A protein has these predicted regions:
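Structural recognition of the beta-strand scaffold that forms the well-ordered cores
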Residues: 1, 45-50, 55-58, 85, ...
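Conserved SGNH/GDSL esterase-like catalytic core that processes O-acyl groups on lipids
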Residues: 1-75, 79
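Stable alpha-helical elements in mature extracytoplasmic
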Residues: 24-28, 73-80, 85, 118-121, ...
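Extracellular/periplasmic catalytic domains that process cell-envelope and extracellular macromolecules
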Residues: 38-43, 47, 86-87, 138, ...
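Short, conserved phosphate/pyrophosphate- and ester-handling motifs at nucleotide-, phospho-/glycolipid
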Residues: 204
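Mobile gating loops/cap/lid regions near enzyme active sites that modulate substrate access
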Residues: 99-119, 123, 131, 135, ...
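C-terminal alpha-helix
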Residues: 214-219
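A structural motif corresponding to the C-terminal end of an alpha-helix
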Residues: 39-40, 80-91, 124-145
């Protein structure tokens, strides 16, 4: 967790104190190609490039230029996708980002300014990623959009139908630094499948399963 698109623009971090640097998308693609056969992409594989939310989370702690961050993130994703295509990839999937305003972190510890900035970043990113999918199109190459924003909104609105009873709270509570600072005691619910979110930011296994089903149904 904690990875961003490009650490030169926004450094991704992990750990309780968010002090452990983690590899970005650029590094991950580079390492994959370095170890791949003949340092080329597998033409039979599906390459899913999914990043962007952490650029906002970590970037907004040091800068208010959120739209520039969104532009830089999508430019990086587009560059890495093109690199894979140029080296033999035939099927590439880019993803939109979900509404961070729905996460327990923003619901319980955010404010109107944070929500407004998050929404502006999300709209800009998702607009740009759709344009990137169009720009990357080539004959005999499949470049597709997995619209995680749309899928997650659909799941949120129909949560009860999927057996999800709790959408605003985290299944696992009190384990983050933010929660500790707010006096939240450590607690794990008995049935995480009834929750939309596992922790302050990440969906539960059940929510991930529903997202995967939506991607498969929409694209494959």
């Amino acid at each position: 967790g904690g990875s961003t698109s490009n650490n030169k623009n926004v450094q991704g971090k992990s750990g309780y104190n968010e002090s452990i640097p983690v590899p970005d998308l650029v590094t991950q693609v580079s390492k994959y190609l370095h170890t791949a056969k003949d340092q080329r992409a597998d033409p039979h594989a599906v390459y899913i490039l999914s990043t962007g939310s952490n650029d906002l989370y970590y970037g907004s702690q040091k800068s208010l230029h959120l739209l520039k961050m969104a532009d830089q993130a999508v430019d990086t994703i587009k560059c890495e996708a093109k690199k894979l295509i140029d080296l033999g990839a035939n099927t590439v999937v880019l993803t939109s980002i979900t509404d961070m305003g729905l996460t327990p972190s923003f619901r319980h510890y955010g404010n109107l300014v944070m929500r407004g900035g998050s929404n502006a970043y999300m709209l800009r990113f998702n607009q740009n990623i759709r344009e990137a999918v169009k720009e990357l199109q080539q004959p005999n190459i499949q470049v597709m959009l997995a619209d995680l924003y749309k899928y997650s909104e659909d799941i949120y609105k129909s949560a009860k139908r999927h057996g999800i009873k709790n959408t605003p709270d985290a299944s696992l509570q009190g384990f983050s630094k933010t929660e500790k600072q707010h006096g939240v005691k450590k607690h794990k619910c008995d049935n995480p499948a009834e929750y939309l979110y596992w922790d302050l930011f990440h969906p539960t296994n059940r929510a991930h399963q529903l997202l995967a089903q939506a991607v498969k149904s929409d694209l494959f």
